[in-house]
Amino acid sequence: MENLPLHVFEKILLKLDPKSLAMMKCTRRSINSHISEDPYFKSNYLSLVGFGLLHNSYYGSKSLFCNPFGDSMPFRYTYSLDIKTRFLCSCSGLLLLFMDYLCVANPLTKRYRFLDHSKSIFLGRNKSGIQSCLHERYNVFESRPNHVYQFEITTGDSCWKLSETTITCSPSVPLADKKPVYFDGCIHWLRKDGSILAFNPETEQARLIPIKFPLELSAVANKFLFEATEKELALISATEESINVYSLEDILIDPKWVLVKEIQNGVLHKKTMRCWNVAAYNGKCLVLWQMNKVACDGDVFGYDLRANKWEVIGWIPEWCDGYQVFYLFKPSFSSAIELKQKVDVETMNMVHGDDCKYISTLRKLMSLIEEISPYAKRLFKKKGKRLMTEEETKLKMTVDEPSSSKCLDVMRFSKKRRFLGMEKINKRKRTVRSAGRSGVVEGFLLYVVTAQYCRNTGEKLPISMVFYGSVFDNMHLLP
């Protein structure tokens, strides 16, 4: 393989599905370096990986539903998780979960890490405080003036930092059912008065974007969704007849919502429909869901903005509640960098108690998401090949450090080496890189807790949680 020209070798790598590419990284340090650090290869490969849709109950459940976009494969789900699990965020191929504890996991690389929130000012007080944060029960502050926001950040197991930044806003609160979104280096919260609270975790600067909802949204009792695409912040306004897509323009000078797309809503079954809402949007696909009256089950519809057509992409069984939370998920292998610890799953399964249940739950979650990788399905379908069974693909992925006899010289980080005929530096870069227009930061992961309190009473309560980034050191391996 060393004799192959670089462009030929990259063509081979680009044809691999994400799981196979992650395995390829384990074969050789130079290949790992090329896949993980070359910005051109990463950009080309990630552009081929499609989005999938994940959802479970807003209050957490033992079931998970997921489906790839643009694939005819039936909607997949599992209902046998050992621990009640709730999805909080999804970013850069990572999932933030809550299963009695906070957990960051990458389904593709089978890496995970539990976060210790006991030293958090906002989350470490008591169990009820955590639940209040997770359920976003902060409407108690809705009518109080002089609201002040604070931010708490963690970059490790027990390293929590209370930012010195505070911001005072008008008496309004973030919408409880609208998730914060990450775009262009900042986390954004949509508030009830239409304004947007933005916080940059890197510079720890916060500001309020003074903007109102579009007039059409204010005048009609409709559904709406606040999302971030690769290029912009978007607001989706939907009625039973039509759906409007707005883009936020001139965010720094004169922010305003501009109508960019109008879609006819012709998929809802009004006679049998009990409730419905907008689920997700990524600039390429729009997702709606509805729950039915008689059968008590539900349907998930997807609209392809490029093909301008609707199709059924999933369903919601009758035993699910009507409070389903949807997340767009894109597999990524980038979090496999610098991860040294691993867990022997077979040994853990023989251990009785709650620890085994957590590991078992993670295994089931990762296995289900891995099986429906959008990129892998599209590749196999194109080549007319059948999908490999679990027994055929079962392979332990270890990223252990080589023995001392095989280690490179300790000065390897300052030396150049030849890789496929090209000079490359085999240094694990820790500099922060921007991953495209979306502003997702690679190289570290931050977990941000936002709190709000009233100056008059001094009462304080965490209101939301979000994380971003793609690399978290010392995560565990789940083979």
Curated annotation (Swiss-Prot):
Matching SUPFAM superfamilies: F-box domain, Galactose oxidase, central domain
Bilayer-spanning residue ranges: none
Name assigned to this protein: Putative F-box protein At1g20800
Coiled coil: none
Domain called F-box: residue spans: 1-44
